[in-house]
């Protein structure tokens, strides 16, 4: 997705699938800040909101993966103790 910088120029945005958890979280925080600040036109606001939704989903995916890794490590540790 590209966001208009109000000069008719666009900034290229990194695909969300390529972002790690911290980068997704930080960008999501920035999206929320921009939306709460207001003053954006409707189209830009909608684009930001849509990107924020995808960022939030990606953060959840990263967290689910981390939870699974911890669960797997704990299960392996318990299996070694038996």
From Swiss-Prot:
It comes from the Bacteria. It catalyses: Exonucleolytic cleavage in either 5'- to 3'- or 3'- to 5'-direction to yield nucleoside 5'-phosphates. Gene3D superfamilies: Exonuclease VII, small subunit. It is found in: Cytoplasm. It holds the Pfam family Exonuc_VII_S. InterPro entries: Exonuc_VII_S, Exonuc_VII_ssu_sf. GO terms for cellular component: cytosol; exodeoxyribonuclease VII complex. Its EC number is 3.1.11.6. One of its GO terms (molecular function) is exodeoxyribonuclease VII activity. One of its GO terms (biological process) is DNA catabolic process. Keywords: Cytoplasm, Exonuclease, Hydrolase, Nuclease. Disulfide bonds: none annotated. Bidirectionally degrades single-stranded DNA into large acid-insoluble oligonucleotides, which are then degraded further into small acid-soluble oligonucleotides. Heterooligomer composed of large and small subunits. Belongs to the XseB family. This is Exodeoxyribonuclease 7 small subunit. It comes from Mycobacterium marinum (strain ATCC BAA-535 / M).
């Amino acid at each position: 997705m590209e966001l208009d910088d109000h000069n008719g120029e666009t900034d290229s945005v990194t695909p969300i699938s390529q972002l790690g958890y911290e980068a997704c979280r930080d960008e999501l925080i920035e999206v929320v800040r921009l939306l709460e600040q207001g003053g954006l036109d409707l189209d830009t606001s909608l684009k930001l909101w849509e990107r924020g939704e995808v960022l939030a989903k990606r953060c959840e995916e990263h967290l689910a993966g981390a939870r699974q890794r911890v669960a797997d490590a704990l299960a392996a540790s318990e299996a070694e103790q038996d």
